[in-house]
């Protein structure tokens, strides 16, 4: 299904390459590796050659190597690719920056072909007007130069040191993908294109901030277009278990998925989590969804809050850290929810404005107590981040998240009161369709099967709260909208509980819901939307995700 022509050019035109750290300016690859164009499990090990500052790749699984792992290209059969990488556990003693660089290099090498596909699919979804490309490039170049300068100038600051680890990983991904492209005789992706992929969430707000548009009818607004999602944390009545789940909403052009398991041997006293499992995409060094299980005992979920107050978007500046970067740094450094919130709040870009739920499983003693600090809720808008401990609400049974701000200040500044005035209570926090459905049905969750069920729920033809709208429900199917079908909506679900999380284990399903007899999504109805590398039909079951490397 996926056609790759030799020497194929990628959009947009290459910008000036941005600066890379000094170590990347040496010859960066050595050795040959066999080509892989087909599905299957592909093993690889990266070796750091310190004398030449080069990387050698061998298609073996060598635990003495500096980074090793595999990519299971099973997208056509399960809807998911699976990537697992361990770095820094080899025979060499390496700096944290080199460990992160090699982890990124190996991921870029193993997943380069799907990175190309994913960029091809997403670029036209975000760049509707070619005139915006130069503005985006200029902003991202300024933001990167500002970030790298702070990393260089503040090496003794733990926050900026960890930001440097993330940037090293990105540099490695770029060069690893470049190495793979040269072997496949493809034109390599530029650094801007890889930055573009990682910033997809941020671009949802950055592009409108750079391109003022005339006011349009709010009635034409499609909630899934901004990457909206549904999330639920459910506590059983006697605190016997705590479940957490997330269902992503966005364009179906984003359905090229990779579930990732990382284990990086970072030696830094300020690093709280160096092992994590999360849902993700090709070329992304973050989840985007978000759904993370962290070795610190934290769980991170997220849903997007739109900013209807366009004046706020004018306050976005490049001298800031993008949301994906701040999430990664907070994930690495935070021991608890409050610390995560404080770290995430630093250098707020005002892009990818979300509600984050930080669940601290260390604060949960089953059948006994859920201690203060177990749930922090964090919300961002341009110039402002608010967070609060909402454990008390969680103790009462559940926390639901459905793309409407919880904190009053964020709700008001984002423009929701005007939206409610113009469009009705469907946009209010308490009486949005998903608020009502979660309130009604969360009590039916008693086990993993019922948790999966509520997160895939769509009974729009019958449910009075849906009023016949296939997106006024937990798992949206905008492609079934009779008036104006679009290939977008809810396209996955990830579910786990406190027991599974201790093993970095989750259940994940890829594709739009087929609950209550809904037809499986088929691309043949929407062939005008690029979907390179994807299955034609999405009708998959839940898959067990669990790391297996030792």
UniProtKB/Swiss-Prot annotation:
May form a homodimer, each monomer is composed of a chain A and a chain B. Residues 1-39 form the signal peptide. The maturation cleavages that produces chains A and B are required to open the putative substrate binding pocket. Both chains A and B remain associated in the mature protein. It is an enzyme of class 3 (hydrolase). Residues 210-228 form a propeptide. Exhibits weak phospholipase activity, acting on various phospholipids, including phosphatidylcholine, phosphatidylinositol, phosphatidylethanolamine and lysophospholipids. However, in view of the small size of the putative binding pocket, it has been proposed that it may act rather as an amidase or a peptidase. It comes from Rattus norvegicus. The gene is Plbd1. It comes from the Eukaryota. This is Phospholipase B-like 1. GO terms for molecular function: phospholipase activity.
């Amino acid at each position: 299904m996926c056609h790759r022509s030799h020497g194929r050019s990628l959009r947009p035109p290459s910008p000036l390459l941005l600066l890379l750290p000094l170590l990347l300016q040496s010859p960066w690859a050595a050795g040959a590796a066999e080509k892989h164009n087909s599905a299957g499990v592909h093993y690889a090990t990266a070796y750091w050659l310190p004398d030449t500052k080069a990387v050698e790749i061998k298609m073996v699984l060598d635990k003495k190597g500096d980074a090793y792992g595999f990519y299971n290209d099973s997208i056509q059969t399960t809807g998911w690719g699976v990537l697992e990488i361990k770095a820094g556990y080899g025979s060499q003693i390496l700096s944290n920056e080199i460990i992160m660089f090699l982890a990124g290099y190996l991921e870029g090498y193993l997943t380069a072909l799907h990175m190309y596909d994913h960029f091809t699919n997403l670029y036209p979804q975000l760049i509707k007007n070619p005139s915006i490309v130069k503005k985006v490039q200029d902003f991202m170049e300024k933001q990167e130069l500002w970030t790298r300068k702070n990393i260089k100038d503040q090496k003794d600051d733990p926050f900026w040191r960890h930001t440097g680890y993330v940037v090293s990983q990105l540099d490695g991904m770029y060069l690893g993908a470049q190495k793979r492209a040269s072997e496949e005789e493809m034109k390599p992706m530029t650094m801007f294109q890889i930055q573009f992929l990682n910033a997809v969430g941020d671009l949802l707000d950055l592009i409108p901030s750079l391109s003022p548009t005339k006011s349009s009818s709010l009635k034409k607004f499609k909630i899934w277009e901004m990457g909206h999602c549904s999330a639920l944390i459910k506590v059983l009545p006697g605190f016997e278990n705590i479940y957490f789940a997330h269902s992503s909403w966005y364009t179906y052009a984003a359905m090229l998925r990779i579930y990732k398991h990382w284990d990086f041997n970072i030696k830094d006293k300020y690093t709280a989590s160096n092992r994590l499992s999360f849902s993700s995409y090709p070329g992304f060094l973050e989840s985007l969804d978000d759904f993370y299980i962290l070795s610190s005992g934290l769980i991170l979920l997220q849903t997007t809050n739109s900013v209807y107050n366009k004046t706020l978007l004018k306050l976005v500046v490049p001298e800031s850290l993008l949301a994906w970067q701040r999430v990664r740094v907070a994930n690495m450094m935070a021991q608890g929810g409050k610390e995560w919130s404080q770290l995430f709040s630093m250098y707020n870009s005002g892009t990818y404005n979300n509600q984050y739920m930080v669940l601290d499983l260390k604060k949960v003693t089953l059948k006994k107590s859920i201690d203060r600090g177990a749930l922090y809720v964090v919300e961002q808008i341009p110039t402002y981040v608010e967070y609060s401990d909402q454990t008390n609400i969680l103790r009462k049974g559940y926390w639901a998240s459905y793309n409407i701000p919880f904190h009053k200040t964020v709700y008001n500044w984002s423009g929701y009161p005007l939206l409610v005035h113009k469009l009705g209570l469907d946009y209010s926090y308490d009486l949005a369709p998903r608020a009502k459905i979660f309130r009604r049905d969360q009590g039916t969750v008693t086990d993993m099967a019922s948790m999966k069920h509520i997160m895939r729920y769509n009974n729009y033809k019958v449910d009075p709260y849906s009023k016949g709208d296939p997106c006024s429900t937990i798992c949206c199917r905008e492609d079934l909208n009779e008036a104006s079908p679009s290939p977008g909506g809810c396209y996955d679900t990830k579910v786990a509980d406190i027991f599974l999380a201790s093993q970095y284990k989750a259940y994940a399903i890829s594709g739009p819901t087929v609950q209550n007899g809904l037809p499986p999504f088929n691309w043949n109805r929407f062939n005008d939307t690029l979907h390179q590398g994807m299955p034609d039909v999405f009708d998959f079951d839940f898959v067990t995700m669990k790391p297996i490397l030792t």
